[in-house]
Amino acid sequence: MDRFSNLPDDVIYHIVSFLSAKEATCLKFVSKNFQNLVTIKRNVVFHHWESFKNFVDGLLAEPASYRIKRFSLKLVSMDFAQYNIVNDCLCNVLKRGVLDLELDINVKEDYILPSDVFTCKTVVRLKLGCGFVIDILPKNALLPALKTLILDSVRFYASDGCAFTRLLSASPVLEELVIDRLNWEHWKGSRFVSSPTLKRLTLRRKEWEPEPETWTDFESVSFDTPSLAYLKYKDVIPYGYPIVNLNSIVEARLTLPREVEYDYWLNRSADPSNLIRGLKNVEILSIKVLHTMDLLFYNFKEAVPVFENLIHLSVTSEADFCWDPLQILLEKSPNLKTLTIEGPLHYNFYEKLDLEAVCECLLGYSFLLSCPIKVLKITEFVGDIGEIVQMKHVLGKLPCLELLEVHVQARRDDKKLQIMADLLMLPRTSSKCKVKVHFS
């Protein structure tokens, strides 16, 4: 028997006012009366002020049974006279069981988000951008359902404790945090990512315009994220990493570039040692910028731990970029299975007249004799004689190799056939090694 249908309409409205849009959707299938009384908007998106203003006028007149599942507001600009209209709308939407809230408003620093944004019980995904300044969170800040938080060009200040730290603390089930167009040095307060539940973290710096005076406010970054499995980190290295807890890390993608102000970086006492040690449990490691290898694994080689769990390593390379840091990484990775070279194979670029010459950093490739990798992938291979000769050295040293996968840049059929023949004729130490060639 459908007991809900026998309830008075005002009681049904009252019940629905406590439900998220998802829960209200479920109840619509339980009770026929609910189907008639409950309205659920799945997707509400606005990019223009006029259409938004008309919506707000109608929204404020809707009963509590009008629920919204996803609300997205994107405004190129907003002046002071529009603040109250936007805030009235947001407060109303937040009471309608919204699950997905996206605010992309180009605001001035004097705009303050309504406190209801930080006390919503239903929101599961929250995106804030671009240009919000979050200074103070309400004392009762709590987002009990929030699992994904995306911040785009958002700055945090610290009038009453660090607003960023408080926001993370108010999100007890947070699983994913994305901070885009990041500029730590413009924040006021700690750069401390702390969450016991966080599983995925993406930090992407907007740009690097070094202003020495800002570095006094950018002394350190810390990670206390014991459940974190995925880290995508594009930034410059601060003075240090006092706390690094990445015990559950599975995959890390690092982009820590050496920019035009590298001399300034060297003059600072920056020390990424704790970050390097904190990655010791990583299983998949990707290094996307060439000089990240030098900055982390060569300049601070003493801090490099043994990567017992590392099975897949991907590094960016160039033909004339020495493999000193790669050698250190390989020697510290006793269980590595797959090595991907994002770029060309390194060889003695400056000794083209001596095809058998081996760059000093390779030491005759002897360090490969104890390398356990089974799969070697090279994404850029032209097939000139220097590359072929150095490939011979590599294949002659890797005892466990089972697959060489090469992506060749060639268009002419005769060139493709020649490269294929050259690669297949190379002697291999491993009798199990097969060669797979992709042409582009």
From Swiss-Prot:
A Pfam family it matches: LRR_At5g56370
InterPro entries: F-box-like_dom_sf (IPR036047), F-box_dom (IPR001810), FBD (IPR006566), FBL60-like (IPR055294), LRR_dom_sf (IPR032675), LRR_FXL15/At3g58940/PEG3-like (IPR055411)
LRR repeat segments: 4-31, 126-153, 156-181, 194-205, 210-235, 264-289, 318-343
Signal peptide location: none
The species this protein was found in: Arabidopsis thaliana
The keyword Repeat is annotated on this UniProt entry: yes
Species classification: Eukaryota, Viridiplantae, Streptophyta, Embryophyta, Tracheophyta
Designated name of the protein: Putative F-box/LRR-repeat protein At5g15620
SUPFAM superfamilies: F-box domain, RNI-like
Keywords for the protein's UniProt record, in alphabetical order: Leucine-rich repeat, Repeat
Superkingdom of source: Eukaryota
Domain F-box, first and last residues per copy: 1-52
